[in-house]
């Protein structure tokens, strides 16, 4: 099957939420981003492959980080949201075309991780320059540590149980603001917009600290949830 032969003619078949991932999508991704991304995916699936969409997603993400670093925060927010939408589009195109692949999943995951790293770093450095306060860097690195723990635990769960971590079902509260990259980037987008419009970087600084603290608590809770819900029937082994 070529890209142009992809089964996109039956538009009703691919209406929201057919292409969503209800177990692993966070609230924001499932209810907002997927509604928009499905519209793009149905129209692009006959014109590009999933890996090309991942490449476009990477461009949006890097552009967002550069804009934030150059102090264009509102434009950065726009690009962050485009990045979030196209983070859904690549996988949706793969499902529409019936061409899901391990390499595609690998590239998609790497793109998400790299872009979030760049964005948090760009926010921390840009905020430091605006406020002339090194605490912004400390808060940014604290958040990156929490992000590392959450993403590593998700990927290890997927490798151990051969399925995505069901954060939407098990972490409904954390899913609103920190358990997934989409919700974290939404919170950071709100922080960027509010701080840029008010001219007060203190809101964004405290948001970085709050997200960092929430991420560490989320990680500890996740350990308990995995132990509680998935330990049964697991043979004892090192």
Regions found by a protein language model. Give the residues of each.
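Core segments of transmembrane alpha-helices
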Residues: 56-63, 112-123, 175-194
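Basic, amphipathic juxtamembrane/active-site segments
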Residues: 78, 82, 91-138
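Short, amphipathic, aromatic/basic-enriched membrane-interface segments that mark the entry/exit
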Residues: 40-53, 106-111, 169-178
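Hydrophobic alpha-helical transmembrane segments of multipass integral membrane proteins
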Residues: 58-65, 81, 85, 117-120, ...
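Helix-coil boundary and interhelical linker segments in multi-pass alpha-helical membrane proteins
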Residues: 63-78, 118-142, 192-207
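Cytosolic-side membrane-entry/anchor segment at the start of a transmembrane helix
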Residues: 9-43, 84-106
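Membrane-embedded alpha-helical segments that form the functional core of polytopic membrane enzymes
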Residues: 52-103, 200-211
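C-terminal membrane-associated helical module and adjoining short loops/tails
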Residues: 1-36, 149, 153-238
């Amino acid at each position: 099957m070529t890209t142009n032969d992809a089964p996109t003619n039956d538009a009703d078949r691919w209406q929201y939420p057919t292409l969503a991932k209800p177990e692993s999508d966070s609230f924001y991704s499932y209810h907002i981003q997927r509604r928009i991304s499905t519209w793009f995916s149905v129209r692009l699936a006959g014109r590009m492959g999933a890996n090309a969409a991942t490449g476009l997603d990477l461009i949006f993400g890097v552009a967002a980080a550069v804009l934030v670093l150059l102090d264009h925060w509102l434009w950065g927010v726009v690009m962050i949201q485009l990045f979030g939408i196209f983070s859904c589009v690549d996988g949706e195109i793969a499902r529409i075309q019936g061409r899901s692949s391990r390499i595609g999943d690998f590239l998609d995951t790497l793109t998400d991780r790299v872009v979030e790293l760049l964005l948090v770093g760009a926010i921390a450095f840009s905020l430091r320059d605006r406020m002339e306060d090194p605490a912004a860097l400390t808060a940014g690195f604290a958040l990156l540590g929490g992000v590392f723990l959450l993403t590593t635990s998700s990927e290890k769960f997927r490798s151990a149980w051969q399925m995505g971590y069901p954060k939407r079902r098990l972490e409904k509260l954390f899913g609103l603001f920190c358990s997934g990259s989409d919700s974290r980037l939404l919170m950071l987008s709100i922080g960027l917009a509010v701080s840029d419009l008010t001219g007060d970087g203190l809101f964004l600084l405290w948001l970085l600290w709050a997200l960092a603290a929430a991420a560490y608590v989320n990680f500890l809770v996740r350990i308990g949830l995995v132990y509680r819900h998935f330990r049964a029937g697991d043979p004892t082994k090192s």
